[in-house]
C-alpha cells in the first residue's frame, strides 16, 4: 500500500517519540512522524489546488466542460494508517475552485479508487469505503457545487451472490 511505501522510505529518518502512553517527555521504543507529514505536504496540497485552478482555465479556453478531480488532492485523507487532518487550511482555495466551476459552467466529478466497494460483505472494507466517499463528498460540499458534481462509484463484484450484493447496496 502507498502508506507502507511512505513508511518504508522514512525508516531510520523518524525520531523517537517523546510521548508514550499519554505521558509527555517519556521516550517510547516506537518511532513516529507525529503527523509531521501534513505540515510538509500542506504546500504540496496547496499547489495541487492552485494547479487545479490553472487546469480549469486551460479547460475553459479549450471548450472542455467536465473535469475529473484527483482523489489525491489531499493525500492519505482517508487512509486508516495515517492520523486524520482537516481541510481548514485549504477551504479558501476549495471555495475558489467551486466558484470558478460555477462561473465557467464546469462539471467537476470524482472517481474514487476501485478499493471503494459498497457491495462488499466485509464490514471493515465497507466502513473504509464510507470514510473515503465522505472525504470526496466533503470536498464537493466545501466547493458548494450542485448535484451535477458527482462521485462515480465502482459497482464491485457480486461475491458469489448477486441478489445479496444488490441488497447490501440498497441498505
Where are these regions (language model features)?
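Carbohydrate-active enzymes and regulators
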Residues: 130
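Eukaryote-skewed repeat-based solenoidal scaffolds used as protein-protein interaction platforms
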Residues: 133-171
